[in-house]
Amino acid sequence: MSATAPNYNHTVTACFVGYITQAVINNFMPLLFVTFAATLGIDMARLSALITVNFVTQLVVDVLAGKFVDRIGYKPCIIAAHLAALAGLLALGLLPTRVPDPYLAILAAIFLYALGGGLIEVMVSPIVEACPSEHKAKAMSLLHSFYCWGQLGTVAISTLFLFAFGTGSWPVLACLWAIVPAIGIAMFAGAPMPRIVPEGTATMRFADLSKKPVFYLMFLMMLCAGAAEQGMSQWASAFAESGLGVTKVIGDLAGPAAFALMMGLSRTIYGVLGHRLNLTAFIASSSVLCVAMYLTAALTTAPVLGLLACALTGFSVGIMWPGTFSMAADAMPGGGTLMFALLAVAGALGCAGGPAVVGLVASANGDSLKTGLLFGSMFALVLLACVVAARKTVVGEREPLH
């Protein structure tokens, strides 16, 4: 009798949980910025540093992952990633209120869960790309939509929890969020792992990737996508409160929550209708919208218009990250873990640099986040130029992946 074929649906579902874990890691702590400033005396520059530590740690893991993940194996590495995320969230909830220097405790917790976040980012995309699927670009976009739904859930649940139990209850909430990576550990423990590089395809080394101009273009696109996405997302809550003058509950729900909703909608649309859409055309039109919304958020004096611009920025950046992954996998099928790791490095660089630049520019201009976002519009402008170059030199009219 022939062996039963592995059921990779469980694997893909576990990857969805992995991206929800990543969303909790990246989006829970920024909701506490105003609380940290008021109760712990942490200024905007040091708050900006917290974001940077998170994404730079993930960046370092991304760099190293290409060297050790294939050697150790995907299953032990993805489980270890969720264990680190679990430990970091528990540390965030338990340590800051129990030590003399809460800022150092927060930094330590961020470092722990960022180790897990970096591994998750590197691994879930190639796992889903390797799982059998008729339209891989659609599957990739759907995977990344779960980051958005995770972000939306993180913001909405956290906001309602803090409203119901008070902002002082945030340590309890941090411990409750640790349930998500615990679920991921259980799911990946029983999930089969696919072959990452297609059978019969040679695995590309760094020397092979470095000889391909398309790799550098994809790297720059990922850099800009991360900066444009997180430059708005990480500061949306604080921008709504301080820049637009709305309450914290309204600011969190209409700022980062609406951003996540629209980003998830964009990715889900392509995840469902991707076989009917041209990927590069979708990215190009989204880039134009991104530029317009950054400028609107920075220049408007109307709170409603500013919140709308923030939300539509989420829609505009939604396809950038998964779309670039799909384009790269199509152009370099032998890229494997190394290619995804290097592209994740570019994305992490953008995620770290984007909000840091916005925060530093704001700090240098009287803590004006409007000025920071105005400067941040350059991320979307550069991204638009990359998309135009990609359409001309890389894929042109791209067919759906099979």
Language-model segment annotations:
Residues K75-I78, I283:
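Primarily marks hydrophobic transmembrane alpha-helices of the MFS/SLC 12-helix fold
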Residues A49-K67, A257-I269:
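Central cavity-lining transmembrane alpha-helices of secondary-active solute carriers
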Residues M29-P30, K212-L265:
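Extracytoplasmic gate region of multi-pass secondary transporters
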Residues F36-A37, F68-V69, L160-G166, A240-E241, ...:
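Interfacial helix-cap and linker-helix signal at transmembrane-aqueous boundaries
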Residues H10-I42, S125, M232-S237, G354:
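Extracytoplasmic
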Residues A109-S145:
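Cytoplasmic helix-loop-helix junction between adjacent transmembrane helices
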Residues E134-H135, A139-I196:
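Helix-loop-helix hairpin linking two adjacent transmembrane segments in secondary transporters
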